[in-house]
Curated annotation (Swiss-Prot):
CDD domains: HPPD_C_like, HPPD_N_like. InterPro entries: 4OHPhenylPyrv_dOase, 4OHPhenylPyrv_dOase_C, 4OHPhenylPyrv_dOase_N, Glyas_Bleomycin-R_OHBP_Dase, Glyas_Fos-R_dOase_dom, VOC. Its EC number is 1.13.11.27. This is 4-hydroxyphenylpyruvate dioxygenase. The gene is hppD. The keyword Repeat applies. It comes from Aspergillus fumigatus (strain ATCC MYA-4609 / CBS 101355 / FGSC A1100 / Af293). Residues 25-169, 201-359 form the VOC domain.
């Protein structure tokens, strides 16, 4: 189904966007978690990531620890505090502030995404264009250095307590960043016993907002970061009997970075967006979509590794089969295999996408992962939103949150 609200406006051509046409894609996603070692183990054992870098006591970092894992070009940093709040006075001011920040983030949000980092050609041009147009500074541009070269970084604020770090790698040839011990080649023994998961890159990263906050956030991306409105749907298109939402996808000038922004809309009961904002205690990253070139292989293997996905009712496939036949569209993949794996299908006259969503990654019903495969289709599954919402509402009802 082609979304009826795709933006027809071209990317902005003012001085902001011209300074920002240097986005290269997502660099990494930084999570604050209660136990980084265990969280890293989850992504390694369940989702086929590999350990690539570490920072902690053994590297001279006495206040926090970080485990870095990667699958394809998808990199997650998982960071935890090593000390309690009553011990912060032992550390220099910068480390004190970091410890306080992590503890406060965990107390307020639970495990969640703190930073979505973008790789850029020039940190300085993106940073100063952003800050000159209203972006809040978290950290000024600075250069990190080790034997593998230099990396330039800077950080700005986005919605809620989430941030965007800008990363300029230049000729740096280390596995991750200066300050981390490289662990490439460190193979988890369990990887020899489990089927492989071969993901490509981050496709998009979705942020949930509270009531009436979406437009303000989108305007911030337009003004400060030079993004443009790539795609949008309203509550008439994304609704069930009980709940609804609105969504606008913001894209970088060259469209290599896409950041969908959601907000709740009026319905009979609490929507999944309201549930998220309630349990996350504010705006934040709802899910990260990971692109694959073989979703059947990867969903099959993720399920074999124990990853839990939402369940799609059989009636969905009876309906989609009729719609596909009417449109004269033939899938490259076997339809019955797609049905058996609960994979969702959306399409238009040009192509189609296949997607499936995990259940929430933690006990708080906040963050989850999407696995997505695209066949000449740049949309975001508008045709699946009703089925997806209904599946999520069934989970909400089990949690007692569909009220």
């Amino acid at each position: 189904m082609a979304p009826s609200a795709i933006s027809t406006s071209p990317p902005p051509t003012d001085r902001v966007s011209s300074s920002l046409a240097s986005y290269k894609g997502y660099d990494h996603v930084h999570w604050y978690v209660g136990n980084a070692k265990q969280a890293a183990s989850y992504y390694i054992t369940r989702m086929g990531f590999k350990r690539i870098a570490y920072r902690g006591l053994e590297t001279g970092c006495r206040s926090v620890c970080s485990h870095v894992v990667r699958n394809g070009d998808i990199t997650f940093i998982l960071t935890s505090p090593l000390r309690s709040l009553d011990q912060v006075d032992r550390f220099p001011p910068e480390e004190q502030e970091l410890l306080k920040e992590i503890h406060a983030h965990l107390e307020k949000h639970g495990d969640g995404v703190k930073d979505v980092a973008f790789e850029v050609d020039s940190v300085d041009s993106v940073f100063y264009a952003a800050t000159n147009n209203g972006a809040k500074i978290v950290s000024q541009p600075r250069t990190l250095e080790d034997d593998n070269g230099q990396v330039r970084v800077a950080t700005i604020q986005t919605y809620g307590e989430t941030t965007h770090t800008l990363v300029e790698r230049g000729s740096y040839h280390g596995a991750f960043l200066p300050g981390y011990r490289m662990e490439t080649g460190v193979e988890d023994p369990i990887s020899q016993l489990l089927p492989g998961v071969h993901l490509n890159r981050i496709d998009h990263c979705v942020g949930n907002q509270d009531w009436d906050e979406m437009d303000k956030v989108c305007e911030y991306y337009e003004k400060a970061l030079g993004f443009h409105r790539f795609w949008s749907v309203d509550d008439k298109q994304i609704c069930t009997e009980y709940s609804a939402l609105k969504s606008i996808v913001m894209a970088s000038p060259n469209e290599v970075v896409k950041m969908p922004i959601n907000e709740p809309a009026k319905g009979k009961k609490q929507s999944q967006i309201e549930e998220y904002v309630d349990f996350y205690n504010g705006a934040g990253v709802q899910h990260i979509a990971l692109l694959t070139d073989d979703i059947i292989r990867d969903i099959t293997n993720l399920k074999a590794r124990g990853v839990e996905f939402i369940k799609v009712p059989d009636t969905y496939y009876e309906d989609i089969k009729v719609r596909l036949k009417k449109a004269g569209l033939t899938l490259h993949e076997d339809f019955e295999t797609i049905r058996s794996l609960d994979i969702l299908i959306d399409f238009d006259e040009g192509g189609y996408l296949l997607q499936l969503f995990t259940k929430h990654l933690m006990d708080r019903p906040t963050v989850f992962i999407e696995i997505i495969q695209r066949h000449n289709f740049s949309g975001f599954g508008a045709g699946n939103f009703k089925s997806l919402f209904e599946a999520i509402e069934r989970e909400q009802a089990l949690r007692g949150n569909l009220v």
